[in-house]
Amino acid sequence: MSDQVIIFDTTLRDGEQALSASLTVKEKLQIAFALERLGVDVIEAGFPISSPGDFESVRTIAKHIKNSRICALSRAVTKDIDVAADALKVAEAFRIHTFISTSTVHVQDKLRRSYDDVVEMGVKAVQRARKYTDDVEFSCEDAGRTPIDNLCRMVEAAINAGANTINIPDTVGYTIPGEFGGIIQTLFNRVPNIDKAIISVHCHDDLGMSVANSIAAVQAGARQVEGTINGIGERAGNCSLEEIAMILQTRSEYLGVHTSLKNDEIHRTSKLVSQLCNMPIQSNKAIVGANAFSHSSGIHQDGMLKNKNTYEIMTPESIGLKNKALNLTSRSGRAAVKSHMDSMGYKAEEYNLDTLYADFVKLADRKGQVFDYDLEALMHFANLRDEDDFYKLNYLSVQSGSVMATTSIKLLCGDEEKCEAAVGNGPVDALYQCIYKLTGYEIVLDKFDLTAKGEGEDGLGQADIIANYKGRKYHGTGLATDIIEASGQALLHVINSIHRADQIAEIKQNKITTV
């Protein structure tokens, strides 16, 4: 049996199900590039049949990612599988992941089929997927609550049909480690063709057991672990891949396995996912939380000063947690910025150098010394902006007293510059009133967050909002050294997304009318 554990990331599919507002194709591609840098073996890019947006995301990621295998999910339905293959075909090699429910409650109450029918559907799905690729994964949904005899039968049939990865999900996070490890061990003992497939696990965190269950499965012989960055996902979330990575590294001698991950990319990847998904990381989160490497107890601090190994089982550097000052000023050239981006592992296709450099110069003029996290934040935010944004903030002035604030703005609306002033309960409220008046959009804010993206008083501030417009949710983000400006950028991000959606709807309607 191999001692390498394959890492299967489903942040862009299962993880996205936890978000209030869907990620854009650009945002998903950014995350995919980060996962590729991290060394993830398989990236589950989406569920193509679910929406045109998901189809386009999978297709785009399959086109651009070269060093990780791209996978798409499909039900055990012919059309699902065909659409998944169509989205993936631009990749040099790809995986189709098809699934069907196998637990008694799912088979009887959801599918309303006999178990014989379910086995036949699973077999046909695998055979259909094999027409497109020799890399097929089959999942037994709710395997954790499936009678073991039925599970063994389904696994054997799927392998005979051509599945070379068999996934055993604890879909509702019901099992505990000894129990789940026992399920995996039983499959190895009772399924005669088990040696022809890699056994994978996909554990949810409803009882807080997802990581522990995954490790128990690895000890029992599983050689693929599925999960998400920061453990994001439906309900209580998924198995946290950064925790799996550091467990397998820190306890490698005991467990006897390893991964191909570049663990020093963990912090950067975690931060990006948190930022784009607008999901803050709890401070005491293992591995990537703000307090993960903090020591406040006097006894602990004394021990750390004498020998870090007294209270530190891994180093901050092992996950890439380090801040290096850039020796760049506003007088530095593009080549210097590009050289530093290269040293951080970013490819030229991941950012526009001219845009990044222009933003860098503005920031350097404001705060002087620029750090890695500043440059990365500028890059990620620049990637969210579109050159064809209809609304652009040209000027902002704020006068604020103890109670009310007055804001004046100049907003570029297409080719026309418009001016507006408004009074509000604070500068952000006044700014938003100006923008509402000039754009005419009636938007309901569901969530508004401000977070620091650097250190010190002159650091960057990020504004994240979730807005509701005509029953649809939109996510907007803004970044600036001034939090009021960042707040305005976040709202304009939303309004430009709405404007583009309205334009597309109008074009579609005109086509229908013409026909």
Curated annotation (Swiss-Prot):
Matches recorded under SUPFAM superfamilies: 2-isopropylmalate synthase LeuA, allosteric (dimerisation) domain, Aldolase
Domain Pyruvate carboxyltransferase, chain residue ranges per copy: 5-267
Binding site for Mn(2+): 14, 202, 204, 238
Region (Regulatory domain): 392-515
Pathway: Amino-acid biosynthesis; L-leucine biosynthesis; L-leucine from 3-methyl-2-oxobutanoate: step 1/4
Function: Catalyzes the condensation of the acetyl group of acetyl-CoA with 3-methyl-2-oxobutanoate (2-ketoisovalerate) to form 3-carboxy-3-hydroxy-4-methylpentanoate (2-isopropylmalate).
Complex and partners: Homodimer.
Descriptive protein name: 2-isopropylmalate synthase
Gene it is expressed from: leuA
